[in-house]
Swiss-Prot record:
The lineage of its organism: Bacteria, Bacillati, Bacillota, Bacilli, Bacillales. GO terms for biological process: DNA repair. It comes from Bacillus subtilis (strain 168). PANTHER family: COMPONENT OF ATP-DEPENDENT DSDNA EXONUCLEASE, PHOSPHOESTERASE. This is Uncharacterized metallophosphoesterase YhaO. The keyword Hydrolase applies. One of its GO terms (molecular function) is DNA exonuclease activity. It comes from the Bacteria. Pfam families: Metallophos.
């Protein structure tokens, strides 16, 4: 008979993320962003204590680098000690970012922390009231690149009433991510697990709500503008063998993309008010926000005729007013994606051909060269088809903006 279980499933904490490219921000804002990966973990641990969960599953990439810092390790140790005081266990696997082949100063983890250090799946039991209630299976990466299917090796090995597989990897055929530790849905089903606690993909996804439940919780804190929306973990309840789960927010800083339609903006004052209204909505989300602002719609004549650099000045003005806000809405970028009413079809056919060339162009060679760079691979994912499409659209917008001069 299964005793009820409550646990947290999280992954991809990425403690010590460097947040490259934004160190020029005002010091208080950059400090808040840089510490956000740590703060999100604190939020999650607070919830674990509040909810009296039985255990926490951390499915890889707790640290952003294999050469993990002492600061990040000691921080995590302190959080785990808080859990120990409440009788909460922790089960950990390490992934491609924090693989066991790195170099660091080792520390001793509290006795409530159970680390799967093996290169192949192994079992660890969770006991409650003297009975084995759950068997948890997992392994850790020994080096960064693991291209073999390990999911097929998972099998039940005890008579526990509930079985959990922890795996840091990629569903075969998925795009936009390095295909580390690829697996198929059949691999997961054949294992006999009741719940699969996945990690590696930073966008939360429920791959299967049926038995077995297969879930990516996403990362606990976004680190760049490609990771928009709420970030956190799943709170899972097992009652009489039935599994229910709900997403819980943990992020400390929210990253968003916000579109502003400028078609009806009569002047710069009106545009400023539109952006202010957008900021007010974002501010109600309850945490500081980093936002990519996108101007869309038909560009009014006054904006087309504005001096060069006007939008750059506008962005600087918006940033200045947020520099001292504790719950800031910081505009990282201002992208002009507006359309010009001018009819570009009357231009030389050469220009029409340029637009067609952009649509047809294959960027794989260019992007693959970037994706192979070791620094890029440490801190970013592969480009998805959606992102490649966005690159092409941005190129067309820039071309249209330059051609407007020829059509006046």
């Amino acid at each position: 008979m299964l005793t009820d279980l409550t646990f947290i499933h999280a992954a991809d904490l990425h403690l010590d993320s460097p947040f490259y490219g934004i160190s020029h921000l005002p010091e208080p804002i950059f400090a808040r962003i840089k510490e956000s990966t740590f703060a999100s973990v604190r939020h999650m641990i607070d919830a674990a204590v509040r909810e009296h969960v039985d255990f926490i599953l951390l499915a890889g990439d707790l640290f952003d680098e294999a050469n993990r810092s002492l600061k990040a390790q000691l921080f995590l140790k302190k959080q785990f000690e808080r859990l120990r005081e409440c009788g909460i266990s922790v089960y950990v696997i390490f992934g491609n970012h924090d693989h066991l082949g790195g170099e660091w100063t080792p520390i001793e983890w509290p006795e409530n922390v159970h680390i799967f250090s093996s290169a192949v799946p192994e079992e660890k039991s969770f006991f409650k009231e003297g009975r084995r209630i759950a068997s948890i299976y997992g392994f850790s990466y020994q080096a960064r690149a693991l291209m073999e299917n390990q999911a097929a090796r998972y099998r039940r090995s005890t008579d526990a009433p509930f079985h959990i597989g922890m795996l840091h990897g990629t569903l075969s055929g998925s795009e936009g991510h390095d295909p580390y530790c690829p697996f198929t849905h059949d691999d997961l089903v054949k294992s006999g697990m009741d719940y699969w606690a996945l990690g590696h993909i930073h966008k939360r996804q429920v791959l299967s709500a049926e038995h077995p439940a297969v879930i990516y919780p996403g990362n606990t804190q976004a680190r760049h503008i490609k990771e928009t929306g709420d970030k956190g973990y799943y709170l899972v309840h097992v009652t009489n063998g039935d599994i229910s789960y709900e997403f819980q927010r943990a992020h400390d800083v929210l990253w968003e993309k916000a579109a502003v339609d400028v078609t009806e903006a009569k002047n710069m004052t009106a545009l400023f008010q539109m952006v202010e209204d957008t900021f007010s909505k974002l501010r109600k989300k309850g945490s500081p926000v980093c936002v990519r602002l996108v101007l869309q719609g038909t560009a009014p004549e006054w904006l087309l005729e504005a001096p060069k650099g006007t939008l750059d000045e506008f962005l600087e003005a918006l940033q200045e007013q947020e520099a001292e806000e504790e719950r800031f809405v910081w505009p990282l970028r201002l992208d002009d994606e507006t359309e010009n009413e001018a009819n570009l079809t009357n231009l030389d056919p050469f220009f029409g051909g340029l637009f067609e060339d952009i649509d047809r162009s294959d960027l794989s060679d260019v992007l693959e060269g970037l994706e192979r760079h070791p620094v890029y691979r440490r801190h970013a994912d592969r480009f998805s088809q959606e992102e490649v499409k966005e690159i092409k659209e941005q190129a067309q917008i820039i071309l249209k903006r330059q051609l407007k001069v020829l059509d006046t």
